UniProtKB/Swiss-Prot annotation:
SUPFAM superfamilies: Translation initiation factor IF3, C-terminal domain (SSF55200), Translation initiation factor IF3, N-terminal domain (SSF54364)
Gene3D superfamilies: Translation initiation factor 3 (IF-3), C-terminal domain, Translation initiation factor 3 (IF-3), N-terminal domain
Molecular function GO labels: ribosome binding; translation initiation factor activity
Cytoplasm keyword on record: yes
Record site feature (Important for 30S binding), residues: 107, 110
Protein name per its UniProtKB record: Translation initiation factor IF-3
Subcellular location: Cytoplasm
Summary of subunit composition and partner proteins: Monomer.
Role description: IF-3 binds to the 30S ribosomal subunit and shifts the equilibrium between 70S ribosomes and their 50S and 30S subunits in favor of the free subunits, thus enhancing the availability of 30S subunits on which protein synthesis initiation begins.
A cellular component annotation (GO) from this entry: cytosol
UniProt family annotation: Belongs to the IF-3 family.
InterPro entries: T_IF-3_C_sf, T_IF-3_N_sf, Translation_initiation_fac3_CS, Translation_initiation_fac_3, Translation_initiation_fac_3_C, Translation_initiation_fac_3_N
Statement: the UniProt record of this protein carries the keyword Protein biosynthesis: yes
Length: 180
């Protein structure tokens, strides 16, 4: 439906005429304390300054109100929450698969990928899969995992190291070391 009336969402803070208290603890534009005043007087001071009276903490006794530009306040609040979201890093678990017979060239390529994952701050899951008769040579698989662990000792901490084989595979999990 085009052109319909929009439902106004409830504001997180009451402003101006929406404030219900008789007296409020007033804070000025610069954050200075102006004391406890009547609601009417507080609204007059806000109108003189050409801004809004915003109820900051309604549960206080008396409620704390501040003289400020409400639009600017909401903008700053949303901007700071976006900044916080941007700073949060979602840690992913990247997986690299090895085989007991992985040759040197392939090993180096996979090792470079592991280094890149760890430097980006992601965890790395190394899966060593056995096929057919390779199951008889599980110690070769352990040697491969130990070699990976030794090659990445500078960058990573082992979170989970396999003590026994699970099905036809061994799994090792590495986490990046915390930067000092």
């Amino acid at each position: 439906m085009k052109g319909g009336k929009r439902v106004q969402t409830a504001r997180p803070n009451r402003i101006n005429g929406e404030i219900r208290a008789q007296e409020v603890r007033l804070t000025g534009l610069e954050g200075e304390q102006l004391g406890i005043v009547s609601l009417r007087e507080a609204i007059e001071k806000a109108e003189e300054a050409g801004v809004d009276l915003v109820e900051i903490s309604p549960n206080a006794e008396p409620p704390v109100c501040r003289i400020m530009d409400y639009g600017k306040f909401l903008y700053e609040k949303s901007k700071s929450s976006k900044e916080q979201k941007k700073k949060q890093k979602v840690i992913q678990v990247k997986e690299i698969k090895f085989r007991p017979g992985t040759d040197e060239g392939d090993y180096q390529v996979k090792l470079r990928s592991l280094i890149r994952f760890l430097e980006d701050g992601d965890k790395a899951k190394i899966t060593l899969r056995f096929r057919g008769r390779e199951m008889a040579h599980q110690q070769i698989g352990m040697e491969v995992l130990n070699r990976v662990k030794d090659d990445l000792v500078e960058l990573a901490v082992v979170e989970a190291f396999p003590t026994k084989i699970e099905g036809r595979q061994m799994i090792m999990v590495l986490a990046p070391k915390k930067k000092q």
